Amino acid sequence: MKRLIALCVMVLLLSSCSQKPAFEELADGACSSEQAQLVNKHISAQIDAMAKDDWELAYSLASPTFRSNVGIDQFIFVVSTQYGMLIDNQGYEFNSCTIANKKITQEVAVSSNSEVFNLSYSLSVDGEVLGVDSSSVTLPDSKLET
């Protein structure tokens, strides 16, 4: 019985060691479900922090490159003046997640003041750490009538 328990513990330990980190390889194409889940969790944490005026937390979720170029005061100013929908959001929904050239793009639909804003987030990975590089409001596709 002791051998069986020891064998089970060893198998569990070995199997947990063999798993690759989610962002070890950033292959072009759609994000894996694990990658998308981690990206969504990261962006959710940043949006929720902004909505709670926890600017230090929101800023800490930006990428190291972003933080080295933009100070926290400038970050707060830009978000407050141009991304009020994130602060006053009534919810958000994650759409497509893709990877191209080692960059992750996550589309997010944010509801605020009876409107839906489509944002495109760009994230990078430094080691195994995700960081938001930028977000931009995307315009809906317009259909041309002929």
What kind of feature is each model-predicted range?
Residues S18-K52:
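Short, low-complexity N-terminal intrinsically disordered segments enriched in polar/charged residues
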Residues M50-T65:
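Short, well-ordered alpha-helical segments enriched in acidic and aromatic residues
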Residues L13-S16:
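C-terminal motif of bacterial Sec signal peptides marking the signal peptidase cleavage site
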